Amino acid sequence: MYKRQVLFRADGSFDAEATNTAIGHALVSIDRAVIPGFYGAMPDGTIHTFSRGGSDVTGSIVARAVGAELYENWTDVSGVLAADPRIIEHPHVVDYITYRELRELSYMGASVLHEDAVFPVRRANIPINIRNTNRPQDPGTFIVPTLPANAHKRKVTGIAGHKGFSSVYVEKSMMNGEIGFVAHLLQIFADHGISFEHCPSGIDTVSIIVSTEALAPAREEILRRIQDELQPDHVSVEDGLALIAVVGQGMIYAKGTAARIFRVIADANINIRMIDQGSCELNIIIAVKETDYELAIRSLYHAVERVM
């Protein structure tokens, strides 16, 4: 019966609204249910599986459909860690984290929940509690729409990062006067199916940060098109970059957070290759050489640990 409630379209995409209605109707009069995960049904009734995180996704879908007050996700860790345990020994567990903060950390490489498992409950403003099956006494991490009042004192929620990026640097005099220059540049990447991670710029310069792996197959063609179509004064590519994100909703209330981050990196004798910070001040992202990645993570974590 279960597969008839979790529904996929003919093209294999998940039909969230039809599924929400079907599960809601099926469970409306049931107090307790054991529901398998990972799969659902195509329009013709054949079984179709979720691509990743199937059991987590199923739990989230059911939580939304029944209007749950809380979605408990039991796993093998005691919650969201503030840093990568492969780099930081025994990083502390985050007690509360917002959906937005979690998305930033997950996108930058933190291994928590697959994004598809968060989306259904986020739409319904249902909190998630990540718990450890092997340590049920641990409170775990609560993923919430907004932080409780006491959590606003925390400046930094976590640090995450990822290696494997390249920077395509383009320079042209009077670039700022050419309407659509950056749009044209980004379209060249889009034509080859490459999305950009960040796009820091100056008056006459712009850098496109992309995945090195994604860039590799079309690298020469992209550089040729940039030269032919945009006529820049200079184009170069820097490989071997790592991106690091310092994430925290409380940073907006703390003066000097960015200055502190830059000072810590400088004191570690690491050169910052790129800086990006949104106006919402939810995160600060820097690029460093891959060879400096682990040292940068350790330096940042120990510097901000007491304000986490």
Tell where the protein language model's regions lie, with residue ranges:
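Nucleotide/pyrophosphate-binding catalytic subdomain
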Residues: 3-113, 118, 211, 287-289, ...
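Short, ordered loop/turn segments at secondary-structure junctions
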Residues: 3-4, 38-39, 75-80, 85-86, ...
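Structured helix-beta-strand junction loops
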Residues: 29-30, 124, 192, 268
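Short helix/loop capping segments that flank catalytic or ligand/cofactor-binding pockets
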Residues: 43-44, 82-83, 129-131, 139, ...
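Short hydrophobic alpha-helical runs that function as membrane-insertion/retention elements
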Residues: 70-74, 128-130, 197
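Active-site C-terminal subdomain of aminotransferase-like
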Residues: 124-139, 163-164
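A conserved regulatory-domain signal marking ACT and ACT-like small-molecule sensing domains
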Residues: 139-308
